[in-house]
């Protein structure tokens, strides 16, 4: 008798949107290592640069796409499904922000960020989700943030760092509710929706240039450290796997305990 690990993703096709970012790269690598065929989807230069660092493989496919462009995204979904298949999993890790203080934020700024953070996320989830529902199976992981649940500590964001802006947190709070709604809407069709709320995961550039900021983040965590990229990647892999087959509508908080203070 051959035992198969519930975490094995062999024969699964997974789209990772935002796959060339800091957390996206770790996620693409993890899913690939677990046997999945991974479509890494991101802006043109980011995708090409990242994929060029990896060993060539038929299970690792790069795509260039601005996921905030609704026309391009809908065409991408239709083309990929018509020429290949409906993916088994969709991971949307995209995010944007103005990095502006609240007093300087215009209505257009707010709307632009949340078009990408909420509207574009919803439309992609709907376009792919309805195809998964028609097939009778699927798995979607969206990305929120600890700042979709709590407000930033002002003292952490001393100059030159800008406090995490309001439009980002508002959008990430919306992702949590979107996840719950879609989980109910398509649950009977065996399509699961979950989201992940990362805690402090500053990218390598921030870690290198702003060690004092990283230190303040670490002190606010009960574990007294920032997160590592692979800790998000393994959380994504878990939610996509059969080990999580009865988890639906859940917001998995991966923050080292930040939000339990």
Where in the sequence are the language-model features?
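Substrate-binding pocket helix/loop in short-chain dehydrogenase/reductase
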Residues: 101-102, 106-114, 154, 164, ...
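Canonical Rossmann dinucleotide-binding motif of NAD(H)/NADP(H)-dependent dehydrogenases/reductases
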Residues: 6-39, 182
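Alpha-helical segment proximal to the catalytic Tyr-Lys
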Residues: 130, 184-185, 245
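Catalytic loop of short-chain dehydrogenase/reductase
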Residues: 141-174, 179-187
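Short, small/polar-rich loop/turn modules that mediate ligand/substrate recognition or access, typified
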Residues: 187, 192, 247-249
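Conserved NAD(P)H cofactor-binding loop of Rossmann-fold oxidoreductase domains
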Residues: 93-99, 257
